[in-house]
From Swiss-Prot:
Family under the similarity heading: Belongs to the complex I NDUFB1 subunit family.
Membrane disposition: Single-pass membrane protein
UniProt function note: Accessory subunit of the mitochondrial membrane respiratory chain NADH dehydrogenase (Complex I) that is believed not to be involved in catalysis. Complex I functions in the transfer of electrons from NADH to the respiratory chain. The immediate electron acceptor for the enzyme is believed to be ubiquinone.
Coiled coil: none
GO cellular component, one term: nuclear speck
Keywords from the named record: Electron transport, Membrane, Mitochondrion, Mitochondrion inner membrane, Respiratory chain, Transmembrane, Transmembrane helix, Transport
Native species: Homo sapiens
Protein name per UniProt: NADH dehydrogenase [ubiquinone] 1 beta subcomplex subunit 1
Amino acid sequence: MVNLLQIVRDHWVHVLVPMGFVIGCYLDRKSDERLTAFRNKSMLFKRELQPSEEVTWK
């Protein structure tokens, strides 16, 4: 039990930093999904695109 507590005390950074990265990536993807729901609702982006024109919301 003492060894487990010592390991946690010594290496907590090695667990929290990757967890923060993974949680940040997950939240970023969810935010992007939420924002794409409003992609064509804005008056600025509602117009028809020219045949050679690319989408602006990549």
